[in-house]
Amino acid sequence: MRREKKSRAYRGSRTHGWGRVGQHRKSGSRGGRGLVGYHKHKWSWTVKYAPDWYGKHGFTRHPSLVVEYRTINVGQLDAEVEEFFRKGLASREGDAYVVDLTQLGFNKLTGSGQVRNKIIVKVPVATKRAISKIEAQGGRVEVAKTQEAGE
């Protein structure tokens, strides 16, 4: 003999446990449709769960002041410099490769990786570590601005 009902789906019950017909219809039971009422009747919810919902927070720098760095590290540059030369994106000056990184779409040279080739690099921004690694192989970096680590 079955002790529990086969289904708990309120078969034959018109309102399925929601009382009168209108009590589970449309948005009245939720206090409005969508993101409504957070500064009115749902204020206690806002205070508890979304305290930063209203007001200004922080600031946005003017786009002209924000520089988006497209970086390449010296290891990547060293690995690809011969390919750049084959494609005509770099030239030779004696035994050194000459690369203008702005023409390749980069505006910053960072110091990660190893340098095996002698490279002369033209770039707007370079880290001191990148400059020292390039110069250790007899190359040089023609740079507008140097950066400390973490800048």
UniProtKB/Swiss-Prot annotation:
- Gene3D superfamilies the record matches: 3.100.10.10, 4.10.990.10
- The disulfide bonds in this chain are none
Q: Which GO terms describe its cellular component?
A: cytosolic large ribosomal subunit
Molecular function GO terms recorded: rRNA binding; structural constituent of ribosome
- Tell me one GO biological process term: translation
Keyword annotations for this protein?
Answer: Ribonucleoprotein, Ribosomal protein, RNA-binding, rRNA-binding
Tree of life domain = Archaea
Indicate, by first and last residue, each region the UniProt record lists as having compositional bias (Basic residues). Answer: 1-14
| PANTHER family linked | 60S RIBOSOMAL PROTEIN L27A, LARGE RIBOSOMAL SUBUNIT PROTEIN UL15
**What's this protein's function?**
Binds to the 23S rRNA.
Q: Which family does it belong to?
A: Belongs to the universal ribosomal protein uL15 family.
Q: Quaternary structure?
A: Part of the 50S ribosomal subunit.
Q: What is this protein called?
A: Large ribosomal subunit protein uL15
Q: Which organism is it from?
A: Thermofilum pendens (strain DSM 2475 / Hrk 5)
Q: Which gene encodes it?
A: rpl15
